[in-house]
Swiss-Prot record:
Name of this protein: Putative pre-16S rRNA nuclease
Keyword Iron-sulfur annotated: no
Biological process terms in GO annotation: rRNA 5'-end processing
Stored PANTHER family: POLYNUCLEOTIDYL TRANSFERASE, RIBONUCLEASE H-LIKE SUPERFAMILY PROTEIN
Cellular compartments annotated: Cytoplasm
Gene Ontology cellular component list: cytosol
Hydrolase as UniProt keyword: yes
Length: 155
C-alpha cells in the first residue's frame, strides 16, 4: 500500500515499459502487491499510438502512472532514457495524473524469466513473445507497489 507521502491516492495504477518500437502496459492497484500485463502499444518512430493508450486509460481509470526509468546496470544513462522521460512528461500533460519514474534495471531479464516459466508450464506460447514488454511493465509496477518511496518524481 502506498505510504501517506506517495503521490497517488488508493486506486488503479498503470505501469509502462518504454521501448523504441513498443510500450508495455500493466495494471495494478495502489493497495495491492501484484500487477498484470494488459497491453502492448506500438511506437512508430517517435510517435506513440495515443488512441490505443487513450483506450487503456478509459478502460482502467487510473489514479496514477508509473514509468520505468531505463538505466544501465551501473546506474548510468542509456539512449532510451531520454525517450522514456519525454513519454512520462507527455503522459502527465495529456492525462493530468501524477507520474513517477521507477528504476527498471533488469526488468526485461525478469520478464523474460517469467515468460519462460509460463511457456514451460504451458500457459504461454512462442507467438505470445510480444507480450514481454507488458510483462516488463508489470515487473516495474510491482517494484513501485513494493516500495513507492523509491520512485522519482518528474521535474
Amino acid at each position: 500500500m502506498p505510504e501517506a507521502s506517495s503521490p497517488f491516492p488508493d486506486g488503479i495504477v498503470l505501469g509502462f515499459d518504454v521501448g523504441t518500437r513498443r510500450i508495455g502496459v500493466a495494471v495494478g492497484s495502489a493497495w495491492g502487491a501484484g500487477a498484470r500485463a494488459v497491453a502492448v502499444i506500438d511506437v512508430h518512430g517517435v510517435a506513440v499510438d495515443w488512441n490505443a493508450l487513450d483506450r487503456v486509460k478509459r478502460n482502467w481509470l487510473p489514479v496514477g502512472l508509473v514509468v520505468g526509468d531505463p538505466l544501465t546496470l551501473e546506474g548510468h544513462d542509456q539512449p532510451i532514457r531520454k525517450q522514456a522521460h519525454a513519454f512520462a512528461c507527455q503522459l502527465r500533460e495529456r492525462y493530468r495524473l501524477p507520474v513517477v519514474l521507477v528504476d527498471e534495471r533488469s526488468s526485461s531479464v525478469e520478464a523474460a524469466s517469467r515468460f519462460a516459466g509460463a511457456r514451460a508450464a504451458g500457459y504461454k506460447r512462442r507467438r505470445d513473445a510480444d507480450t514481454l514488454d507488458a510483462i516488463a511493465a508489470a515487473v516495474i509496477l510491482e517494484r513501485w507497489l513494493a516500495d513507492p518511496m523509491q520512485a522519482t518524481s518528474l521535474p
